[in-house]
């Protein structure tokens, strides 16, 4: 999603691959997968982001997500 990242492509791709393996293991349909991933995002925001920054971080995440699926 991000244009510049402090994480390597290898780190990101490895984490994505592991998450997708879990979803495939559970034969999770798309709607369940999105629900679970969304709940993970909420969990991270609530526990790892200071309350005064949560709304802005959530909005930045949503904007980046929308941009990542936007048709060219």
From Swiss-Prot:
Gene3D superfamilies: YejL-like. Pfam families: DUF1414. InterPro entries: UPF0352 (IPR009857), YejL_sf (IPR023202). It comes from Shewanella oneidensis (strain ATCC 700550 / JCM 31522 / CIP 106686 / LMG 19005 / NCIMB 14063 / MR-1). This is UPF0352 protein SO_2176. NCBIfam families: PRK13689.1. It comes from the Bacteria. Belongs to the UPF0352 family.
């Amino acid at each position: 999603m991000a244009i510049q990242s402090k994480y390597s492509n290898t780190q990101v791709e490895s984490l994505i691959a592991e998450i997708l393996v879990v979803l495939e293991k559970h034969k999770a349909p798309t709607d369940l997968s999105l629900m679970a991933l969304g709940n993970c995002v909420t969990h991270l925001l609530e526990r790892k982001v200071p309350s005064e920054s949560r709304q802005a971080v959530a909005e930045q995440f949503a904007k980046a997500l929308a941009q990542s699926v936007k048709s060219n």
